[in-house]
Amino acid sequence: KRIWDGQDNVLEIGPFLGGSTRAIALGMMLNPNKKNLARVYTYDRFGKYHKPEELLHFLAPMFERGILGETEKQFILKNNSFLEVFDIIHRQFEYYRMIVPQRAILNDIPPDQDSDNEASFRFEQDQVTPFNLPEELTYSAVFVDGCKSWYGTKQFMQITLPKTSKGCYYIFQDYGTHTCFWLPVFLQVFNKYFKLVAFVDHTYTFELVEELSQETISKNFPDSPADIPRSEYELLFKKLQASAINFNDTYSVLNYQLQYAGLLGYLGYRDEARSLIVKQLNSPFALTHRQWILRALEWSTYDSQGNNIDLFLPKEI
């Protein structure tokens, strides 16, 4: 009741197989203020994250329990899609009436910068509809787990913000993931519009405290990370760290360092990025987060095509 007022719909992007979607729908059903027509609209490309064999391995427990059968197996092998699997998993439960799954994709680079219209998406093109929202719907809670790129985040927020009002909560499930530096950058650039209200593990919840226009986003958040001066990033991440200290959020004090290193690597400063991450191994953070730091050293972030930014590659001449 404190996060969702029950009056508008809930929006989710990136549900995968719907674990979070299920929790959202169950919570909505328990809210006494829920309007009858309120639903959770969940968007995903519902396919091609994994090779079919990998997806089948991930789903093995459901095959063993009889939830999925040979028909679903053959469908996955043939189509590399899991929307039908999503439906089978949830349709037997009452909460599924609250869920409206939709196929859609976000661009990872601006379409007008892509001469062959193939690199706009991290995965090969298919017939999935580009992400958009129905004109008649509004939302008062937004769960974000599908903004896996800088431009995709910009596109999502430009489309979504006009459908939400002050008081809407945005729940960013990848905010604390070291690869996704664009999320804290976006929220810090527009920090007067968003107020941090809660965080658990990697998930950070912000309240929209002032309406943010598409024009303001276009003016202040460019299409590429390379279009912001490095000096601005240095100041931005210092402010983020200061905020984390004020919240006694020791994990983010470390993670902002890892995200800044990922950004440096993305911009081509690989030696500096590597040194910054290695430095964390000699800090007190390594006592509790050593594996997380080593993971960042191995996979600091990725480019718009989904390729790892390898911090151990020699500089290009």
Predicted regions and their residues:
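S-adenosylmethionine/decaboxylated-SAM
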Residues: 3-313
